[in-house]
Curated annotation (Swiss-Prot):
Residues 1-81, 325-392, 556-642, 856-955 are annotated as: Disordered. Keywords: DNA-binding, Metal-binding, Nucleus, Transcription, Transcription regulation, Zinc, Zinc-finger. It comes from Oryza sativa subsp. japonica (Rice). Zn(2+) binds at C717, C720, C738, C750. A zinc finger (CW-type) spans 708-758. This is B3 domain-containing protein Os07g0563300. Its main location: nucleus. The keyword Plastid does not apply. Residues 62-71, 382-392 have a biased composition (Low complexity). It is found in: Nucleus. Residues 332-342, 556-565, 598-608, 878-900, 920-933 have a biased composition (Polar residues).
Length: 955
């Protein structure tokens, strides 16, 4: 009877829908809550129990087929890789999910309990990646770090000089950290391992796009250390609004207007750079953020902002508490974020103009010298910007560039100079700007004015050459880089707002460059600058325009400011200067220059301008001749462009300068130790003599050894120029006389005779030829007459002889030797040369006299031949106006000549050997007849006639 009851147990195999449905969806093999069949689920356990108890073989293959699925998917279904760790062999347990590190696609690595325990305690790589490459040692403590793994990216930092360092050592040294390959490691500085992981998971959010991590990496490395550090700190240590840093899908580059942040490494991290970041926020219309919200500085680098009020939906519930996450970051005392200044973007009181809402220490930093109410024309918006920049700067740059100088600049609201430029440029190029000038520079413009450098105009810069030489380091630091010598045109704005186009180029100079601005003459003339004045160069940010200002010389500013200074001592407004215009409200408005630079008042009519010009000229001391008109309204042109007083040429022929004609080795011999005994100091076995007084300049002496072998020295008296013999150890002062001779009482007076004559002394002492002539020149100076131009040939011969001064200066060429006889080298400077007496018997004077005697004899013969032949002779200047009779008239030719001519004829003779110096009164004085040809004596030159007329008897 039991046989009919067999069909009911066969229903489970017949009930094919459950297995078919299970086989139709083999991918959904997951835990029970993910099964897609809720109705048969409660009936399946009883059927399974009955099937196991009645007939286990039939349901077992179907159940295995249901779990395995198709043959192609059999291996992954047999050994499911649930744990994300590739080195973990244990499948995932029934426990909750364990989140590990974040993946590149935005998901999290799902780990088992064992792997998660290793990851949580920071030993994941030490447990599973010991055999994997990429291990390096910490440069400080030697700890092993896995640098080639995404799991350990938060455990180390990159050093600037190369190598890596663990986070603990980096926290101790407070080193500036560079970003890692994908994420910044600076966010983990103030947290332990567990807090680092939690904060990393909560705050990190990947940007959209296919190459998000690569774009983030390139963007970080293209910025400076300051930018990347600021960007990453604001991105991870603070809870930024959702979507503010997102990129549009497919965007892998930065716009051109964002590229100006990339060159911030060329500028110092001064408040100007931070003000520029905060000011850029209002320029782009992001007015929803507060000025003290630190998340906005990160938003500037990613301009694809969305609604900042939306929360990040990628964060799980309970993990996006802004205040909790922020407190977790700032609670650590080692954190670089100040805990006294609460950076929370949800406090509306900071947006108000209430002074009580301003944090302590910020309101006083921006007050000017005029009082706490004057904020240097800074509105509420600018005040918030400066407070934000100051707070950010105190947080991120407290160990780098903040010093007393920059704190003083913060009080003025503008930087004086770039910190990098101050360390590179010479002090004479530093822009010297006072607080008042800085206040007028800021004006009503929202732009930041950064003084770059200044340069004093030289005579060539202020001349008509049309070029301004720039300091090399200043040009390379602030002007565009040029590779060709032709350069490029450069637009520069002057103090009145007018734009000038200069040619910025360089000249190759000894493997270097000399940078110049060409075409600056019209600009300098419009500013009425001259040599000695100073031109200043500044930069207007963020436009990057160059501003060329000026400042008058200090020796003229006091006198020029006198007419325009008011009686009450208050500086006049900008309208009182004709070199400064009222600044416009536009960003490109002219920058007003300092008040003390300008010296003239602005006039509204030509008459007032002429009056002002007269007043300005009357305040300056001018040298005007008798024909100079001082009432002209036009500016008087300067004849000389030299700076300061005119430097006269140093005359080397003066008696005082003769003492300087010694070499450096000879000057060392003149140094004598002080009279006091020195103190002996032994340092490392070496004895040193220390004197309390400096060495003195002693008298020059000559050490001589006589025939008997005795050593002594010879010195010359300062008064009588006599030589005295002194002991070897005698130390003489610079003004030594015979009265100071305490070693020889017989010759302690200038009246005493010299021991030996000059010939014997010259054999022992190497006296220069100029030494004796120097003393003789003092006596015979009054008896020497000025030589004339006819002695040029004599000068050449004298310079060739050894009797003259060897150091006689001439206007010779730079590379000519001292014995050069060219027309340039033989000319003495300023017409001064060797002087000869009338009775001089040197070779040159004798040669000149013989030459003159020969010329006179030839002339007499010619005149005699003319008289004999009856050829009419040309009238001379001294002849009378009577006509010369022709030959055959019966009258003697000499009877009709003038008395002067007769006297000249009688005066000519062989005994005439000298030239009278009275000839210097002739109109042809000091002239050389270069056209004179002795072989052509038929024509007489006027010079020879004048010489013959002024000649007298040599006796």
């Amino acid at each position: 009877m039991s046989s009919p009851a067999q069909p009911p147990p066969t229903r489970p195999p017949v009930a094919a829908p459950p297995p078919s449905l299970a086989a139709a969806a083999p991918i959904s093999v997951q835990p029970p809550p993910l099964q897609p069949k809720p109705p048969p689920h409660p009936q399946q356990p009883p059927q399974a129990v009955v099937s196991v108890g009645v007939g286990p073989p039939p349901p077992t293959p179907q159940h295995q087929q249901q779990q395995q699925g198709p043959p192609g998917h059999a291996p992954p279904q047999q050994r499911p890789r649930i744990c994300f760790n590739a080195h973990c062999k244990d499948p995932k347990s029934d426990g909750p999910r364990r989140r590990g590190w974040r993946l590149r696609n935005g998901d999290f690595a799902e780990l088992c309990d064992r792997c998660y325990h290793s990851f949580e305690h920071g030993g994941f790589c030490e447990t599973f990646h010991l055999e994997v490459a990429g291990w390096r040692n910490c440069e400080s403590c030697g700890k092993r770090l896995h640098c080639g793994c995404i799991v350990s990216v938060h455990a180390f930092v990159h050093l600037d000089a190369g190598g890596v360092e663990c986070v603990m050592c980096a926290r101790k040294s407070h080193a500036a950290m560079a970003p890692s390959q994908i994420w910044s490691s600076s966010m983990h500085m103030a947290q332990n391992v567990a807090d680092r992981k939690d904060n990393f998971v909560k705050s990190w959010r990947p940007p959209a796009g296919q190459f998000s991590s690569q774009w983030r990496q390139n963007n970080m490395w293209s910025m400076s250390t300051m930018q990347s550090d600021l960007q990453q700190r604001l991105a991870f240590e603070f809870d930024r609004p959702s979507g503010s840093e997102k990129l549009l899908p497919g965007r892998t580059f930065i716009h051109a207007h964002e590229k100006k942040f990339d060159d911030m490494h060329d500028r110092s991290t001064t408040p100007a750079g931070m003000n520029q970041i905060m000011r850029e926020r209002y320029a782009n219309g992001h007015t929803q953020h507060t000025t003290l919200d630190p998340t906005y500085a990160y938003t500037l680098y990613h301009r694809e902002g969305t609604n900042p009020n939306l929360h990040d939906h990628s964060h799980h519930a309970g993990e996006n508490d802004h205040l909790t996450a922020r407190k977790g970051v700032t609670s650590d005392p080692c954190s670089s974020v100040s805990t006294t200044f609460k950076l929370d973007s949800h406090h509306p009181s900071i947006l108000k103009d209430d002074p009580s809402a301003v944090p302590a220490g910020l309101s006083s930093n921006f007050s000017s010298a005029n009082g706490p109410k004057d904020h240097i024309r800074i509105g509420p918006t600018q005040q918030q910007q400066q407070m934000a920049s100051s707070s950010l700067q105190k947080q991120f740059y407290s160990h780098s560039v903040i010093d007393n100088d920059f704190q003083a600049q913060l009080r003025n609201g503008r930087p004086r100079m770039d910190a990098k430029a101050r360390s590179q440029l010479l002090p004479r190029y530093w822009p010297r700007i006072t607080d008042q000038e800085l206040q007028h520079l800021s004006g009503d413009s929202n732009s930041v004015i950064t003084p770059l450098f200044e340069k004093m105009l030289s005579a060539s810069d202020a001349g008509r050459i049309g070029r301004l030489v720039l300091p090399k380091k200043c040009a390379e630091a602030y002007f565009p880089a040029i590779s060709q010598a032709e350069g490029l045109p450069l637009k520069v704005q002057d103090a009145t707002g007018k734009e000038w186009v200069f040619q910025f180029r360089f000249w190759p100079n000894n493997n270097s460059r000399m940078y110049v601005l060409e075409g600056v003459t019209p600009c300098i003339q419009s500013m009425q600058l001259q040599a000695g004045d100073t031109v200043t160069f500044s930069r207007i940010d963020p436009e990057g325009k160059l501003v060329m200002g000026f400042r008058k010389a200090t020796n003229l500013s006091a006198e020029q400011d006198q007419p325009t200074k008011p009686a009450n001592g208050v500086l006049p407004p900008p309208e009182a200067n004709n070199k400064v215009v009222v600044p416009d409200s536009s960003p490109n408005a002219a920058v007003p220059r300092p008040i003390k630079v300008n010296t003239e008042s602005k006039s509204s009519s030509p008459v007032e301008q002429a009056t002002a010009c007269k007043i300005d000229k009357g305040a300056l001391p001018q040298k005007e001749g008798p024909g100079t008109s001082s009432s002209s309204p036009l500016p008087v042109k300067r004849k000389a462009t030299s700076v300061g007083p005119k430097i006269k040429r140093f005359h080397m022929d003066s008696e005082e300068s003769m003492e300087l004609k010694i070499t450096w080795e000879e000057a060392q011999e003149l140094l004598r130790p002080p009279p006091k005994a020195p103190s002996i100091v032994v340092v490392d076995g070496h004895e040193f003599e220390e004197y309390e007084e400096p060495p003195i300049l002693g008298r020059r002496t000559y050490f001589v050894t006589d025939q008997s072998g005795e050593n002594h020295q010879w010195a010359q008296c300062e008064d009588c120029s006599k030589w005295r013999k002194l002991p070897v150890d005698a130390l003489l002062p610079s003004k030594w006389t015979c009265s100071d001779n305490k070693w020889d009482s017989e010759r302690s007076s200038c009246d005493s005779a010299q021991e030996i004559n000059m010939e014997e002394l010259g054999e022992m002492i190497p006296i220069k030829p100029g030494a004796a002539k120097k003393t003789k020149g003092k006596v015979d100076t009054d008896n020497i007459d000025v030589s004339d131009g006819l002695d040029t040939l004599a000068n050449l011969a004298i310079l060739g002889e050894g009797e003259s001064l060897p150091s006689q200066p001439t206007t010779r060429h730079p590379r000519h030797r001292p014995g050069c006889s060219c027309i340039v080298c033989i000319q003495p400077p300023s017409g001064k040369g060797p002087k000869h007496k009338q009775t001089c018997t040197c070779n040159v004077c004798m040669t000149v006299r013989r030459r003159f005697r020969t010329l006179m004899m030839r002339r007499e013969k010619r005149q005699q031949s003319e008289k004999d032949s009856g050829v009419p002779r040309k009238r001379e200047p001294g002849q009378s106006s009577e006509p010369v009779p022709q030959s055959g008239s019966g009258a003697h030719p000499t009877s009709t000549s003038s008395p002067h001519q007769r006297a000249d004829t009688n005066g000519e003779g062989p005994e005439d050997m000298s030239i009278d110096n009275k000839r210097t009164s002739s109109p042809v004085k000091n002239q050389i007849d270069l056209n004179s040809q002795p072989e052509r004596e038929d024509e007489q030159s006027p010079k020879s006639d004048a010489t013959r007329l002024l000649r007298d008897n040599p006796t």
